[in-house]
Protein backbone atom coordinates (compact mmCIF):
# COMPACT_ATOMS: atom_id res chain seq x y z
CA UNK A 1 0.00 0.00 0.00
CA UNK A 2 2.45 2.71 1.14
CA UNK A 3 6.07 2.83 0.22
CA UNK A 4 8.79 2.32 2.78
CA UNK A 5 8.34 5.15 5.25
CA UNK A 6 11.83 5.04 6.74
CA UNK A 7 14.84 7.25 6.10
CA UNK A 8 12.73 10.06 4.61
CA UNK A 9 13.94 13.57 3.88
CA UNK A 10 11.76 16.35 5.31
CA UNK A 11 10.08 17.00 1.94
CA UNK A 12 9.17 13.36 1.38
CA UNK A 13 8.13 13.03 5.03
CA UNK A 14 5.85 16.07 4.80
CA UNK A 15 4.21 14.73 1.65
CA UNK A 16 3.70 11.28 3.21
CA UNK A 17 2.10 12.93 6.25
CA UNK A 18 -0.12 15.16 4.10
CA UNK A 19 1.33 18.49 5.26
CA UNK A 20 3.94 20.96 4.06
CA UNK A 21 7.51 21.34 5.27
CA UNK A 22 6.68 24.48 7.25
CA UNK A 23 4.06 22.53 9.19
CA UNK A 24 6.71 19.96 10.14
CA UNK A 25 9.02 22.71 11.36
CA UNK A 26 6.18 24.40 13.22
CA UNK A 27 5.28 21.15 15.02
CA UNK A 28 8.94 20.73 15.96
CA UNK A 29 9.09 24.25 17.42
CA UNK A 30 5.90 23.54 19.39
CA UNK A 31 7.31 20.28 20.76
CA UNK A 32 4.71 18.11 19.02
CA UNK A 33 7.31 16.38 16.87
CA UNK A 34 10.87 15.56 17.88
CA UNK A 35 13.61 16.88 15.66
CA UNK A 36 15.84 14.00 14.59
CA UNK A 37 19.60 14.22 14.94
CA UNK A 38 21.44 15.64 12.00
CA UNK A 39 24.42 13.45 11.16
CA UNK A 40 27.56 15.49 10.58
CA UNK A 41 27.40 16.98 7.09
CA UNK A 42 24.15 15.25 6.30
CA UNK A 43 20.42 15.87 6.49
CA UNK A 44 17.85 14.81 9.04
CA UNK A 45 15.85 11.69 8.30
CA UNK A 46 12.35 10.79 9.39
CA UNK A 47 10.48 7.51 9.71
CA UNK A 48 7.06 5.91 9.86
CA UNK A 49 6.58 6.82 13.54
CA UNK A 50 7.02 10.49 12.61
CA UNK A 51 4.45 10.19 9.81
CA UNK A 52 2.01 8.55 12.22
CA UNK A 53 2.58 11.29 14.80
CA UNK A 54 1.87 14.10 12.32
CA UNK A 55 -1.27 12.32 11.13
CA UNK A 56 -2.34 12.03 14.78
CA UNK A 57 -1.85 15.78 15.28
CA UNK A 58 -3.85 16.60 12.14
CA UNK A 59 -6.67 14.23 13.15
CA UNK A 60 -6.84 15.75 16.62
CA UNK A 61 -6.91 19.26 15.13
CA UNK A 62 -9.85 18.28 12.93
CA UNK A 63 -11.68 17.23 16.11
CA UNK A 64 -11.09 20.70 17.54
CA UNK A 65 -8.25 19.98 19.95
CA UNK A 66 -5.80 22.84 20.51
CA UNK A 67 -2.08 22.25 20.07
CA UNK A 68 -1.65 22.27 23.86
CA UNK A 69 -4.37 19.64 24.22
CA UNK A 70 -2.76 17.60 21.45
CA UNK A 71 0.58 17.78 23.26
CA UNK A 72 -1.16 16.39 26.33
CA UNK A 73 -2.77 13.59 24.30
CA UNK A 74 0.62 12.72 22.83
CA UNK A 75 2.03 12.55 26.34
CA UNK A 76 -0.72 10.06 27.22
CA UNK A 77 -0.09 7.92 24.13
CA UNK A 78 1.60 5.02 25.90
CA UNK A 79 -1.72 3.19 26.27
CA UNK A 80 -1.87 3.34 30.07
CA UNK A 81 -3.62 6.69 30.42
CA UNK A 82 -6.99 5.99 28.82
CA UNK A 83 -8.92 7.61 31.69
CA UNK A 84 -6.97 10.86 31.36
CA UNK A 85 -7.40 10.86 27.58
CA UNK A 86 -11.11 10.19 28.02
CA UNK A 87 -11.36 13.09 30.47
CA UNK A 88 -9.71 15.42 27.95
CA UNK A 89 -12.17 14.27 25.30
CA UNK A 90 -15.12 14.79 27.65
CA UNK A 91 -14.02 18.39 28.30
CA UNK A 92 -13.64 18.95 24.56
CA UNK A 93 -17.11 17.49 23.96
CA UNK A 94 -18.57 19.89 26.55
CA UNK A 95 -16.81 22.80 24.82
CA UNK A 96 -18.25 21.70 21.47
CA UNK A 97 -21.76 21.47 22.91
CA UNK A 98 -21.46 24.96 24.41
CA UNK A 99 -20.25 26.36 21.10
CA UNK A 100 -23.14 24.66 19.29
CA UNK A 101 -25.60 26.29 21.71
CA UNK A 102 -23.97 29.68 21.14
CA UNK A 103 -24.03 29.16 17.36
CA UNK A 104 -27.73 28.23 17.47
CA UNK A 105 -28.46 31.47 19.35
CA UNK A 106 -26.41 33.44 16.84
CA UNK A 107 -28.28 31.79 13.98
CA UNK A 108 -31.62 32.77 15.51
CA UNK A 109 -30.59 36.41 16.00
CA UNK A 110 -29.12 36.70 12.51
CA UNK A 111 -32.18 35.06 10.95
CA UNK A 112 -34.43 37.57 12.72
CA UNK A 113 -32.27 40.47 11.54
CA UNK A 114 -32.24 39.24 7.94
CA UNK A 115 -36.01 38.78 8.05
CA UNK A 116 -36.43 42.28 9.51
CA UNK A 117 -34.24 43.73 6.76
CA UNK A 118 -36.35 42.09 4.06
CA UNK A 119 -39.59 43.15 5.75
CA UNK A 120 -38.52 46.81 5.94
CA UNK A 121 -37.21 47.07 2.40
CA UNK A 122 -37.20 50.66 1.21
CA UNK A 123 -37.20 52.20 4.70
CA UNK A 124 -34.41 54.56 5.63
CA UNK A 125 -33.31 52.61 8.71
CA UNK A 126 -31.95 49.10 8.30
CA UNK A 127 -32.74 46.88 11.32
CA UNK A 128 -29.46 45.00 10.97
CA UNK A 129 -27.34 48.16 10.94
CA UNK A 130 -29.40 49.70 13.75
CA UNK A 131 -28.97 46.57 15.84
CA UNK A 132 -25.22 46.43 15.28
CA UNK A 133 -24.99 50.11 16.24
CA UNK A 134 -26.77 49.27 19.48
CA UNK A 135 -29.89 51.26 18.66
CA UNK A 136 -32.17 48.29 19.06
CA UNK A 137 -31.26 44.81 20.24
CA UNK A 138 -32.93 41.94 18.41
CA UNK A 139 -34.78 39.38 20.51
CA UNK A 140 -32.35 36.89 22.01
CA UNK A 141 -29.30 39.06 21.34
CA UNK A 142 -28.53 39.39 25.03
CA UNK A 143 -28.08 35.61 25.16
CA UNK A 144 -25.37 35.64 22.51
Swiss-Prot record:
It comes from the Bacteria. This is Mercuric resistance operon regulatory protein. GO terms for biological process: response to mercury ion. Gene3D superfamilies: 1.10.1660.10. PANTHER family: MERR-FAMILY TRANSCRIPTIONAL REGULATOR, REDOX-CYCLING DRUG-SENSING TRANSCRIPTIONAL ACTIVATOR SOXR. One of its GO terms (molecular function) is mercury ion binding. Mediates the mercuric-dependent induction of mercury resistance operon. In the absence of mercury MerR represses transcription by binding tightly to the mer operator region; when mercury is present the dimeric complex binds a single ion and becomes a potent transcriptional activator, while remaining bound to the mer site. Residues 10-29 bind DNA. Residues 7-76 form the HTH merR-type domain. Pfam families: MerR, MerR-DNA-bind. The keyword Manganese does not apply. Hg(2+) binds at residues 82, 117, 126. The keyword Disulfide bond does not apply. PROSITE patterns: HTH_MERR_1 (PS00552), HTH_MERR_2 (PS50937). Keywords: Activator, DNA-binding, Mercuric resistance, Mercury, Metal-binding, Plasmid, Repressor, Transcription, Transcription regulation. Transmembrane segments: none annotated.
Amino acid sequence: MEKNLENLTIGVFAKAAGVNVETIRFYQRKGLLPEPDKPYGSIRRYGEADVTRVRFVKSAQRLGFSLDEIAELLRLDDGTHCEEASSLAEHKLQDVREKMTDLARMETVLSELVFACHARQGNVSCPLIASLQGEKEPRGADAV
